[in-house]
Amino acid sequence: MFFGKIKKTAISIVLAIACVMVTCGITSDPAYAADMGAVYGIYEHGTGWSGYHGDKTAVRAGNGSYVTAIRASLLGQPDGMSGTLSYQVNLSGTGWLSWQENMTPNGSTETDMPLEAVRMAFTGQLAENYDVYYSVYQNGSWTTPVKNGETAGTEGQGLRVDGLWVTVTGKGAAVPEGPNERSVDPTRPMVALTFDDGPSKFTPRILD
């Protein structure tokens, strides 16, 4: 009898707490934030770090330069939602480096070796609620956006990464349109490359 009353009292307390949580809008899962986005930067050979660029910004190295490292994080991550935006790079001559996060540089700022490919992915609850899409500028154009750990770029083909584009969407949302800037201006004359001029050690494109 005594233990029965204790059991009923405990159940009543649990129900009361549940009612308060519902009434106050408190849940066990953090709220989804539609306006969360990526923020990122590139290390441009011969120049240094670019500024921080927001979600869906196409960031490219200057003419004749290329990317040797990247860094990235998030803006607007929901309070209480676990996880980070992680990123991995393939450094020419070295291969895939370890995953990094929270604006930790990944690549090299003390070498002339370019990046050849990039991977990005969410961890924790972020991975359950969001997709991260990304593209690199390589061989004269932007690659088709890939997501969640897939490889953007090439490996072992001698092609360098010249730019980076990143965007965040809700889990399972439609595939976003990639960078739409023109890679070639047909109104500008083409420059012939002679034997004396090059190519450079790391050509930005496949030469015919």
Language-model features and meaning:
Residues 20-35:
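Sec-dependent signal peptide cleavage junction
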Residues 8-10, 25, 186:
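Residues at the start of alpha-helices and the adjacent loop-to-helix junctions
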Residues 177-208:
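Active-site beta->alpha N-cap acidic-glycine motif
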Residues 1-6:
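N-terminal secretory signal peptides that target proteins for export/translocation
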Residues 8-19:
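Sec-dependent N-terminal signal peptides
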